[in-house]
């Protein structure tokens, strides 16, 4: 009798253990399946968000294509400069959220690249002057400029106050210099000595795309000072013309506006003069796409260049 009870007890215990094992297996399968479903769902949402962001870029490009015919945004069709510079107001407009249907949305903001400092084009002196004019201590600005140049240049020879790969390795840095162009302005956060507060202060005036030309009719004084041959006197005179809504159409008008020392400095620097622009011909489009109720946001950045009256997308990045 006891033997029978022992057998039945063992069988019951075995059944319980089997039930526990099957439950654990079912739970694991459920967790794995849910994880995979989330991956698939996020992938699908990312794909649709990417399409929405790309739609934002294309819709904005189509709007820009109409401006040479209609005149610039915010200006009369027959207003001064509307034919010569049809994009003059395009960089100051931001599109509201646009619904595409099927619960997809985008928002796109155009930025005049001529009002930004291209950190892949600017030289060390120009970068130092930009940083100093942006209220950064001159000694700190000089060190930052050298470290940024060391990160960007192709060699491993450290500037006096800069930093190369070995310096980052010794300090246990997570990211090492690429010895090539920056892919995004926020990569500056990896440069030695860069703080969040300083980066957040200067990043809105930085870019990594475009020709590096600066629009004298719209750029701020710090951005103007990043140009070779641009003096503080010249930048102040240009800023005064901007405040007075006096448009500068060409280099001759600019030189006539400047005090003699500032004019001579610019005339003696053909590289700086070549990087002057008097109209908006490059726009950086920053588009965000998403689905209703989804936390996934897809960002697409594109460079649109005006060739004659045609806007062409010459570069884009999606992340």
Task: Enumerate the predicted regions with their spans.
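Compositionally biased linear targeting/interaction segments
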Residues: 2-3, 7-319
């Amino acid at each position: 009798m006891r033997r029978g009870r022992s057998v039945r007890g063992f069988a019951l215990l075995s059944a319980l253990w089997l039930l526990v094992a099957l439950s654990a297996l079912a739970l694991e399968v459920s967790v794995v399946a849910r994880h995979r479903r989330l991956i698939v769902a996020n992938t699908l949402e990312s794909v649709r968000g990417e399409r929405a962001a790309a739609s934002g870029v294309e819709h904005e490009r189509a709007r820009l294509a109409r401006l040479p015919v209609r005149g610039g945004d915010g200006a009369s069709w027959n207003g001064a400069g509307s034919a010569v510079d049809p994009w003059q107001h395009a960089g100051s407009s931001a599109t509201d959220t646009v619904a595409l249907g099927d619960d997809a949305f985008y928002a796109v903001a155009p930025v005049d690249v001529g009002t930004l400092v291209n950190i892949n084009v600017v030289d060390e002196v120009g970068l130092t002057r930009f940083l100093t004019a942006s209220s950064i201590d001159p000694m700190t600005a000089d060190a930052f400029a050298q470290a940024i140049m060391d990160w960007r240049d192709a060699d491993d020879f450290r500037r006096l106050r800069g930093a190369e790969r070995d310096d980052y390795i010794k300090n246990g840095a997570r990211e090492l210099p690429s010895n090539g162009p920056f892919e995004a302005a926020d990569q500056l956060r990896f440069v030695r000595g860069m703080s969040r507060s300083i980066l957040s202060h200067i990043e809105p005036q930085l870019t990594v795309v475009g020709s590096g030309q600066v629009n004298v009719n719209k750029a701020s004084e710090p951005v103007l000072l990043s140009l070779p041959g641009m003096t503080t006197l010249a930048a102040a005179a240009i800023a005064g013309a901007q405040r007075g809504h006096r448009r500068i159409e060409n280099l001759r008008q600019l030189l006539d506006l400047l005090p003699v020392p500032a004019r001579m400095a610019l005339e003696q620097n053909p590289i700086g003069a070549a990087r002057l622009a008097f109209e908006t011909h490059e726009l950086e489009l920053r588009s965000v796409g998403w689905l209703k109720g989804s936390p996934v946001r897809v960002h697409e950045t594109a460079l649109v260049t005006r060739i004659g009256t045609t806007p062409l997308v010459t570069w884009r990045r999606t992340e």
